[in-house]
Amino acid sequence: MEFTTAGLCDQFHGTHPLQIVEPLFRPFGAVSRFHGRITTLKVFEDSVLIRETLAQEVDGRVLVIDGGASHRCALLGGNLARLAADNGWQGIIVYGCVRDSVELGTVPIGIRALHTHPLDSHKRGGGDRDCLITFASVNFRTDHYLYADEDGIVVSEEKLI
C-alpha cells in the first residue's frame, strides 16, 4: 500500500501516539519507502546477532538496530543486506554505520544508517534482541510499526495502513 510519512503525520498526528525519528539518518538500499513491524536489537560493534536475526525468514518486518551510534566500524554491509532481502525483511534502521554503500544501493531493501565506515564489525556474539531501545528521540519496541520514506521515519504502536 502506498503511503508517505508526511501523509501519515497529517492523518494521524494528535489522534494516535506517533513518534517521529530525528532526521539523523542517510538512505541506503534500493528501496526508499518501506514499512513493517519492528524487531529490535541492541549491539555494540558486533554483527553476530544481526546475522542470526536476518537469517530468519519473516513476513515484512523492519529490523531496528541500536549500535550505540558507533563510528568505529560498520554493522551492516552488502552480504547481510542481501540475506535480509532474501528472507523477507522490508527494511533495516542502523543507529551506527554501514559499508559497501554502492552495493547496498542495488539490494531491494530499505536501509537507513548514520554514516558509512569501511571497517567490518567484531564477531564476538554479544547483544540483546526484542528489548526496548531508544535513540533519535524515539522508543522502539518489538511489534510496534515503522514507516520510512524520503521525508523521514515514523513509529506507531498501532498499524496505520
UniProtKB/Swiss-Prot annotation:
Divalent metal cation. It comes from the Bacteria. Its cofactor is a divalent metal cation. Substrate binds at G77, G78, N79, L80, R99. Pfam families: RraA-like (PF03737). Keywords: Lyase, Metal-binding. SUPFAM superfamilies: RraA-like. It is an enzyme of class 4 (lyase). InterPro entries: RraA, RraA/RraA-like, RraA/RraA-like_sf. The keyword Ion transport does not apply. One of its GO terms (molecular function) is oxaloacetate decarboxylase activity. Catalyzes the aldol cleavage of 4-hydroxy-4-methyl-2-oxoglutarate (HMG) into 2 molecules of pyruvate. Also contains a secondary oxaloacetate (OAA) decarboxylase activity due to the common pyruvate enolate transition state formed following C-C bond cleavage in the retro-aldol and decarboxylation reactions. Belongs to the class II aldolase/RraA-like family. Homotrimer. This is Putative 4-hydroxy-4-methyl-2-oxoglutarate aldolase.
